[in-house]
Curated annotation (Swiss-Prot):
Name used for this protein in its record: Protein translocase subunit SecA
Organism (species): Solibacter usitatus (strain Ellin6076)
CDD domains: DEXDc_SecA, SF2_C_secA
Gene Ontology cellular component list: cell envelope Sec protein transport complex; cytosol; plasma membrane
Chief location bin: membrane
Cofactor mode of binding and number, as noted: May bind 1 zinc ion per subunit.
MF (Gene Ontology): ATP binding; metal ion binding; protein-exporting ATPase activity
Residues that, per the record, bind Zn(2+): 949, 951, 960-961
Group of enzyme by EC: translocase
Amino acid sequence: MIDAVLAKVFGTKNEREVKAMLPTVAAIGALEPQLRELSDIDLAAKTIEFKERIAQGATLDDLLIEAFAVVREAGRRVLNMRHFDVQLIGGMVLHKGKIAEMKTGEGKTLVATLPCYLNALGGQGVHVVTVNDYLARRDSEWMGRLYKFLGLRVGVIVHDLDDQERKDAYNADITYGTNNEFGFDYLRDNMKFRIDDCVQRVHNFAIVDEVDSILIDEARTPLIISGPSEESTDKYYKINRIIPKLVRGEVIDGKEPGEKYTTGDYTIDEKHKSSALTEEGVLKLEKLLNIGNLYDPQNIEWNHHVQQALRAHVLYQRDREYVIRDGDEGPEVVIVDEFTGRLMPGRRWSDGLHQAVEAKEGVKIQRENQTLATITFQNYFRMYKKLAGMTGTAETEAAEFYKIYKLEVVVIPTNRSMIRKENTDMVYRTEIEKFRNAAKEIKEYNAKGQPVLVGTISVEKSEHLSGILKKLGVKHEVLNAKNHEREAGIVSQAGRKNAVTVSTNMAGRGTDILLGGNAEFMTKDECLKRKVAEKLTEDQVQYVADEHFYYFTHNEQFYRVRRDLWDEIYKENKAYTDKEHDEVVELGGLHIVATERHESRRIDNQLRGRAGRQGDPGSSRFYLSLQDDLLRIFGGERMQNLMLRLGMEEDVPIESKLITKRIQKAQEAVEAQNFEARKHLLEYDDVNNKQRQTVYGLRRQLLEGEDQKQRVMEMVQGIIEQYIDMRCPDAKHPDNWEMGDLRNDILTQFGYKIDLNELASLSREEMTNTIFDRLQAKYQEKEDLVGADVIRQTERIVMLQVIDNQWKDHLLSMDELKQGIGNRAYGQKDPLVEYKKESYELFTAMMDRIEDETVRYLFFLQVNTGSGPVMPYPDEEEDGDEDSVEEEVRPDPTEQQRLAAKSTMEDFTRNVQRKKEREMEQLQFVGGDGSSTPQQVVAGQKVGRNDPCPCGSGKKYKKCHGS
């Protein structure tokens, strides 16, 4: 109440923030006349001037007014687009590291040029993050003309670029790319063996387009790089045959308060999208699988596969969560993004769920993959020194943006007043009535020529409504995951007279719906039909203004056409679309018909936002039924009772603001539930993130070539101290120390047989120092033989290889820990606290193994001089006195032997690097919107027990690292 009164007197916080920027907007405008007087060369030279001033101590804030004015003038000259004052405000909001909420059609793409240019002047790079490759290419080409005019370099990161192309793109001043590609490049860089192979620079400043989609909707989807697992697919087939034999039950209230009973073999909780076996179901499965107790530790894999198969059968439906389409190796399961309706061909559900769906659908089951590297978008984007975002719908999630990312949301005023009419929801009893009446309204609007965009929540529902419209004789386009390739073309013409477009949620982003049609798209199509457009390679594309040719893309292919011809065709089309625009405006603009409320208000707002852009008229209406998931699951009994009181008859809707408010309350409840799920994920991933930062930080030190000899010697010292503590504890008298075991420990770990007589009268500290001195001398002998440079390179390669292998195993252990940690709640323990505690223990154990394995590799690595090994190995020692070792007197190696030894070590490092490169080619990339298509997964060749050990020791695998 008090907040409302204060807002009326002083304005809201958002209004005050926007008002505070108006003097800066005026200052930018004041520079416009003098900048217009500059030649193109002088205007572009401002970039050099700004960089020089930064070098002399000026801050980016000091340059903001002048830099924004320069970009505004460059936009006018190069793009024929002058930034509106509200766009300048949007640019300032982004520069401050906040989220700018700008309505559809307000020019977010152009707004980004202002902070991009200003922040690129600092020389550390700016990343512009988009939701798909199409937008990354389009925006880099479109806005790239402006940046290149001002002397900045522009790069774009899309799938199928090699490392050098990626590196060049990241070294540009401004880099466009998808969230997937940026995240995967970060993970890939932390799997490389050479610093020169790394492609990313520092994470300086990122502007995330459609920030709500990337940082909210996809926050629960981690990016995963995986390699092939050895697990068989037989269990999936066996369990898949059994699940259909189970009978669905329900949860029934007992006589006592809080008492619950279950019937059947399993139950479904639609509110939380989960399924659970009943006691009867568990007993039936144990009998059918013939495995005894399903919850015995030895049956943990069976239990896991059963739970996933149950989910696949009862929670995941074809043409809703996924579609079946032809792939390279036959039919395949492709996920449909629940928020956009787009296909996600590169993405697979984890933990065996995708395989369970494949078994259910009878398509070829792909083997589960083992995670090699993973990160959530939440933790990736929090690495940037400064983060900003743009979207048309962020205000409803403002609290989450601030709590998780410390990002404030500022709503930018529209350039022209919004005059869209938002009609009250129409609620029917059944889904059949809802679709029947929605189709009638679509036909009525279509009959008078008004364009209609229809929103549905799934492929299945879009095709159902399409069938009804066909029967009514309404000509229309269908846009869903099955024909997404035509998305941009269909959406761009959805504002034409008589157009009816039935779409899933995917029509919400990327392409404006212009009333009367999009003249640019029409001109592209006409140029292609007339065959006057010349196909180009990417290298031939010109970004700067070209008086002879106009460049454009179509279906990710580059073209150019003579500028005079383009201008002629465009002028004709523009005159036509302008005339049609006025006719559509007279009819009332674009009308939105939504056939269901989404769980998130943002998705509903995105659909509404397609109408009424830039001051155009428009209208929207939602058609709902009591059978819709949101109303049925989350509306509750109060909603049902309210409907009955209002009185419902067949084909007679209830049109009530009270109902609309109740629906919004249900949506808020779902959003709160989803926020808790994302927050819960982040709490667990923060544990992994700290460990990832430690491991990746260590790798980075190695890649940057820091001298690791001291680190290796510290490892040696630490291992010796562990052995001394274990075999010669303070609590025991020296006569009871386990000296023989100590000797064997050192022999096994370092390949060195210590002289027990030499240690007989020494204290623990003296023993540690003596053993360390002997091992250090042995290591120095190897270094003297091959040279310091070669041994340093070998240390680096060995440590990287060991870290990667141990990290891979650690991620598997962490996955297994996370799967079962929820059960700790039954023992009155906090699962998160337990997870933190046990994951720390796992991490400590991994770091110890890294040290042990690294030292063992380095000490056992065979150096061949061309005349046999230089140093003895444990299984090659001659039998002799167990307590004494006669020190071998070895002549100094010849120069020829040194060269042979050096060559051996260099061959080893080269072989390891080649092996790593082959492994990198076999990786699979999973996550986000699936725009990164997986590369072929090829199982690595298994090492036989009698094969030479890959570590290079020269021994058989079974006697070295296979022991």
